[in-house]
Amino acid sequence: PMTINATETMALIDLSRKNNTLLMEAFMYKIHPQTKKIMEIIQQKLNPPLNINAEFCFSVDVPETHRLVNRELGGGSILDIGCYPISIARHAVGAANGKNFLNPISIEGEGELNSQEVDLNASAILKFEDESVAKIKSATNLSSESDVRITDGSNTILVNQPWHCGEFTDRKSQLKIIDKEGNEEEIDISTDKGIYALEIDHFSETFHSQSTESRLIPHNDSHGNMISLDTWRQELRVVYDEDRGERRKSPIISNEILRETLPTLKIPGIDKELSRLVFGCDNQSDTNHAFAMFDHFYMKGGNVFDTAYIY
């Protein structure tokens, strides 16, 4: 994904907008015509709630210093490939409801960890507000078909190359639709360019349109996916130093930025100018998020914090 956690993604999006700079997450499969076709079929033929099965799994034998399984390098199947099944589940449920995506309202996960407490494989059940359910899985020590199945009980979509979209089969792939009578319809997908070339073309077009975000991978989609990935990791207790504000090697909000000013006032007995705007400290998801928000508030000129936690 774009970053290790949702707080870092939030900070990048803020910088992108402040500096009028294009920021796009490199999810190649979302650009491909196959994915567009899947979402069109969902909108035309399926009704919520959906039942989704999505996997991205492979098996490799690598030392624990390898980036796939190294805690210090953000290793683990969830961040390496789990971001794919969780994103297509969100998109499919969104498409069934006439939206780009919907975020799950609950995530229950489990998995297998290595000696560094990094996930070698992970599975999760996602539940959505429309009662859709997605079962997803990622693994770097187990192989599977790595396919996607989406159904509403009447019509079913089967995707056997959801992530590479025919990249390794002469740029040709196929979708299968099965109705409740068992009748099958096959839809062939082919492109004259590779999946990564299509991704580069889309980025270039977005850049030349002077947009700061992609219409296919907007910022709120990337941020929502990262929040879901954070929750999935928390279920397995997979935690990186970058998730803990007190353990980060560098702050998310740079202290080299020129500090701004806010209107201030004086209170008798206190020798400091106090910002009239006070930061309420509740609703922080973790120390990482809290430190980033507090630093941002300080760099904007704030210096008064309300630390009460009961309202």
Where would I find each of the regions flagged by the language model?
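Beta-strand-loop-alpha-helix segment that lines the small-molecule cofactor/substrate pocket
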Residues: P1-F27, G301
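C-terminal helix-rich "cap/oligomerization" subdomain common to oxidoreductases
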Residues: E129, S204-T261
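N-terminal binding-site loop/beta-alpha segment at the start of enzyme catalytic domains
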Residues: R247-Y311
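NAD(P)-dinucleotide binding in Rossmann-like oxidoreductases
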Residues: L113-D119, E129-F207, S211-N220
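Short glycine-enriched loops at secondary-structure junctions
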Residues: M2-T3, E55-V60, N283-S285
